[in-house]
């Protein structure tokens, strides 16, 4: 494939939650443009399957690591291993998260609120912060540039009953990204949020459930369909 302006060869991209769904969509975009990809996710079998797909798509190098981003200790150790293997980091996609589980705020136990934010907000923040730390060090050594990307949601703009944990994490990380864009712009490090709508991923449930969702809600969108992970190829690159 002709890469042109989107040539990712020689660049190293980290995708958290990159072994499936939207995260794998981001990673595939980088792989198709020849970039190196690091995946952080907890499931070793899914990591291995994702690695095979990314290598087949044309990635330069692919490494997967079992990292739980709810743990700052694991994030820091993950970066140590990534830097030992690749020697640099050029792009971070903070994508790890989960689907919301409740239909009313009164059904949401307080501990589940904290558990959700530990991954989708606190984990994303620490992942982006530590990735930026490496990028800034590289910039100060004479090689500026980098990209920080958070996976947001249309819940940034529209309220949803019972989805306070999900929406709060997305709004919080969007605010973090805006601050990072201002702080790190002088190093030519970009910071952006991608805000998907309804995307059919394995978290939606079985094939029958996914088809019901696609058939019910797809016609209500301007393009007449829901989204799929492969729609994120171009965004990833």
Locate each region found by the language model:
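Conserved glycine-rich cofactor-binding loop
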Residues: 19-21
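Substrate-binding pocket helix/loop in short-chain dehydrogenase/reductase
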Residues: 103-105, 112-117, 213, 217
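Active-site loop-to-helix junction immediately N-terminal to the catalytic Tyr of the SDR YXXXK motif
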Residues: 108, 158-167, 179
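Active-site helix of classical SDR
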Residues: 128, 169, 177
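Alpha-helical segment proximal to the catalytic Tyr-Lys
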Residues: 133, 182-186
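Residue(s) in the substrate-gating loop at a strand-loop-helix junction
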Residues: 153
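C-terminal helical subdomain
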Residues: 193, 215-237
């Amino acid at each position: 494939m002709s890469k042109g302006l989107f040539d990712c060869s020689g660049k190293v991209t980290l995708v958290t939650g990159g072994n499936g769904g939207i995260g794998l969509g981001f990673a595939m975009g980088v792989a198709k443009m020849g970039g190196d990809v690091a995946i952080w996710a907890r499931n070793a079998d899914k990591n291995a399957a994702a690695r095979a797909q990314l290598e087949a798509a044309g990635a330069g190098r692919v490494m997967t690591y079992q990292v739980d981003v709810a743990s700052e200790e694991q994030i820091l150790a993950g970066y140590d291993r990534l830097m030992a293997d690749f020697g640099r980091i050029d792009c971070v996609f903070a994508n790890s998260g989960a689907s919301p589980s409740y239909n009313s705020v009164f059904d949401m136990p307080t501990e589940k609120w904290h558990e959700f934010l530990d991954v989708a907000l606190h984990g994303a923040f620490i992942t982006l912060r530590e990735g930026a730390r490496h990028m800034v060090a590289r910039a100060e050594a004479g090689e500026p540039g980098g990209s920080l990307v958070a996976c947001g949601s249309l819940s940034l703009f529209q309220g949803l009953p019972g989805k306070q944990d999900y929406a709060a994490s997305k709004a919080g990380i969007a605010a973090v990204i805006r601050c990072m864009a201002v702080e790190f712009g002088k190093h030519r490090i970009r910071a952006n949020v991608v805000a998907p709508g309804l995307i059919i991923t394995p978290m939606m449930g079985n094939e029958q459930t996914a088809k019901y969702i696609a058939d019910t809600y797809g016609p209500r969108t301007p393009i007449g369909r829901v989204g799929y992970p492969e729609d994120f190829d171009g965004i990833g690159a």
